[in-house]
Regions:
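Conserved ABC ATPase "signature" region
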Residues: 8-11, 48, 52, 59-77, ...
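Conserved ABC ATPase signature
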Residues: 19, 81-85, 89
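Conserved signature/switch motifs of ABC ATPase nucleotide-binding domains
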Residues: 25, 80-83, 101
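Short coil-to-helix segment of the ABC ATPase nucleotide-binding domain corresponding to the Q-loop/switch region
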Residues: 41-48
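Conserved ABC ATPase "signature" C-loop
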Residues: 160-162
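ABC ATPase "signature
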Residues: 166-167, 175, 246
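The conserved cystathionine-beta-synthase
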Residues: 207-242, 247-266
Length: 266
């Protein structure tokens, strides 16, 4: 292996075992694919386990753990045991446990892959909502490209242990840098994933023939529905009440066609 893992300005690969344990205990929390809850402990005790490891009593961590259990939708479940909960509810406990630890970094290793599709979507939406509020560093590992495109601010694609491409997800989808990435993204529903901000013309000058206003974060799929399929339309692109661009429907249609590596954007 090679490379560095920089955290707070330090390469953690240089840490000894004791320092790694301290970092893991105080600076990083984890959400596991198989939940990893203690079956003989209540939901509340599982959520507060990081505090207990540090020698704090249930009385001291109960309020913090309850706050995060409530936040992830588990109000009134603190006295239940993991076996009494569904898979989705157990993973909510796992997220509450990570949040109760109050670490700056949350590592989520295939955290939602064991859940059925509907619950998985709910958990993805919950994570997006929490991240918008908390602004933590979340490292999310997944084999599901749709999930990665939905959740990631910065996407890193690996093959055989090496980084093949990394960038903002929209950029990777529009600009695959080699045949592997091109094949990797070929089956993605581009209209559902791509956002207006990725295909708009950046300008604060309104078009002369404006058909309406759209938000910079709207999906192309939603714009197609609004336009009724009229490829001659132009829209003002707004962000927080201010124009940030113009969307030409012809550019939207062009973005739906996958680009091969090396092709320049028009």
């Amino acid at each position: 292996t090679s490379g560095e893992v920089i955290m707070n300005g330090e390469n953690i690969l240089d840490y000894n075992e004791r320092r790694l344990r301290e970092m893991r205990k105080h600076e990083m929390s984890m959400v596991f694919q198989k939940f990893a809850l203690l079956p003989h402990r209540t939901v509340l005790e599982n959520a507060g386990i990081s505090w207990e490891i540090e020698g704090k009593t249930r009385k001291k961590y109960a309020a913090e753990a309850t706050k995060w259990l409530d936040r992830v939708g588990l109000q009134g479940q603190g006295d239940q045991y993991p076996a009494q909960l569904s898979g989705g509810m157990q993973q909510r406990v796992g997220i509450a446990r990570a949040l109760t630890s109050n670490s700056d970094v949350m590592l989520m290793d295939e955290a939602f892959s064991a859940l059925d599709p509907l619950i998985r979507t709910d958990m993805q939406d919950l994570l997006i909502e929490l991240q918008a509020e908390l602004h933590k560093t979340v490292i999310f590992i997944t084999h599901d490209l749709d999930e990665a495109l939905k959740l990631a601010d910065h996407l890193v694609i690996l093959k055989d242990g090496f980084i093949v491409q990394q960038s903002e997800p929209q950029h990777i989808l529009l600009n695959p840098n080699d045949p592997y990435i091109e094949a990797f993204v070929s089956d993605i529903n581009r209209a559902r994933v791509l956002r207006v901000r990725s295909v708009m013309e950046k300008t604060d000058v309104p078009p002369s023939d404006v058909a309406g206003e759209v938000d910079h974060d709207d999906t192309l799929e939603s714009i197609i529905a609004v336009s009724g399929g009229d490829t001659t339309n132009n829209y003002r692109v707004m962000r927080e009440g201010r124009q940030v661009g113009v969307l030409h429907m012809r550019d939207l249609v062009r973005a739906l066609v996958p680009r091969h590596p090396g092709e320049a954007a028009e």
